[in-house]
């Protein structure tokens, strides 16, 4: 707290504190890079739609700002999440008496919520960026099946067309991409559902 009061940065938590309050940054995650005296800062801009426009200016401005706050000998690397397209398809049967289109919208919203890397800590109501967390299809499916009005739900496809090691930027989604699908959290997705009423 004393360091933060002086508006200086030494630990990853200090860099996160300064990055999160920087204009244009919605949330950041900061970590030490193993074996070096460097801080790796990943940021998500405010009101980001997945496009790359404006990234360079924000990265440069934040890097310059953090360079004035770091101690001598520390390297600051500011980067962005990597976007990776994902395709989710499912079959859905709505219970009688429920609007199947509204149930479908609720399902799509739940998928987006589960795969979104921007998370809120329930106790503190503070946002954080979850990068590198495991994604479990069963976990997502259980959350969706709890939605009111669902009689049957099954994911038929959950994949990406991008080969491992070739991260891309997409206007639809953002994710920190690691080598395995199971270690990726997605922001948005291409979702298609086949829906019927019971």
Q: Which role fits each region the language model picked out?
A:
Residues 2, 6-133, 195-198:
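Carbohydrate-recognition loop of C-type lectin domains
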Residues 81, 124-127, 153-198:
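Immediate N-terminus of the mature polypeptide
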Residues 111-166:
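C-terminal structured "cap/appendage" subdomains that terminate the fold
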């Amino acid at each position: 707290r004393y360091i933060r009061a002086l508006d200086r940065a030494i630990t990853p938590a200090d860099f996160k504190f300064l990055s999160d309050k920087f204009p244009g940054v919605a949330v950041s995650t900061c970590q030490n890079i193993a074996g070096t005296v460097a801080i790796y800062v990943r940021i998500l801009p405010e009101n980001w739609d997945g496009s790359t426009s404006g990234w360079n200016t924000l990265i440069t401005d934040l890097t310059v700002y953090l360079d004035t706050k770091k101690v001598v000998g520390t390297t600051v690397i500011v980067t962005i999440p990597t976007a990776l397209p994902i395709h989710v398809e499912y079959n859905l049967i709505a219970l009688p008496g429920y609007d199947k289109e509204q149930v479908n919208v609720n399902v799509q919203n739940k998928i987006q919520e589960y795969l979104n890397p921007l998370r809120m800590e329930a106790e503190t109501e503070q946002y954080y960026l979850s990068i590198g967390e495991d994604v479990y299809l069963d976990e997502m499916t259980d959350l969706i099946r709890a939605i009111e009005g669902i009689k049957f739900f099954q994911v038929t496809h959950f994949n990406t067309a991008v080969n491992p090691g070739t991260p891309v930027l997409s206007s639809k989604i953002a994710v920190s991409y690691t080598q395995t699908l199971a270690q990726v959290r997605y922001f948005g997705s291409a979702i298609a559902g086949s829906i019927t009423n019971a």
